[in-house]
């Protein structure tokens, strides 16, 4: 009886630990995190989520939002294709920027993000 309980408990613990070590988030979750970091004006997180070649562009985009208040509305992203080893991700929703009471909306569906998984984690590496 003790042996059966021990085996069942060990199996249960193994299954629980396997659930906790799922693979890294997909490219769509990385793009969502990237856009959230942009909205929250988190340059450190934005850099972490960007490829080295895209980082300067990402930080330039961030600079363009520094003087305005932003909100992110209706964000959902999905992988819509591939380009070689890269994933193509499109998003729905918008960034609404407010400056001196004037609102400007940036439609997120106007761009397709390019995500790359060359380091074991998905990173945003461009947009088209």
Each PLM stretch: what is its role?
Residues 1-5:
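Positively charged n-region of N-terminal signal peptides that target proteins for export
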Residues 11-12:
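Repetitive helical segments and hydrophobic/amphipathic motifs
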Residues 15-18:
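C-terminal motif of bacterial Sec signal peptides marking the signal peptidase cleavage site
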Residues 20-22:
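Bacterial signal peptide processing site
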Residues 24-31, 39, 104, 108:
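Solvent-exposed, acidic/flexible segments
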Residues 29, 43-88, 92, 99-100:
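Short solvent-exposed beta->alpha transition segments
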Residues 34, 38-46:
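Short helix-adjacent coil turns
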Residues 81-128:
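Exposed beta-sheet edge and beta->alpha loop/turn motif
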């Amino acid at each position: 009886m003790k042996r059966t309980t021990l085996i069942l408990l060990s199996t249960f613990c193994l299954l629980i630990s396997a659930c906790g070590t799922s693979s890294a988030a997909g490219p769509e979750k990385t793009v969502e995190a990237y856009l959230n970091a942009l909205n929250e004006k988190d340059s450190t997180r934005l850099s972490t989520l960007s490829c080295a070649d895209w980082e300067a562009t990402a930080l330039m985009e961030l600079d363009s939002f520094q003087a305005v208040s932003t909100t992110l509305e209706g964000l959902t992203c999905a992988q819509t294709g591939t380009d070689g080893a890269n994933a193509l991700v499109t998003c729905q929703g918008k960034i609404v920027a407010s400056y001196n009471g004037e609102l400007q909306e940036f439609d997120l569906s106007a761009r397709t993000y390019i995500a790359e998984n060359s380091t074991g984690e998905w990173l945003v590496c461009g947009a088209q």
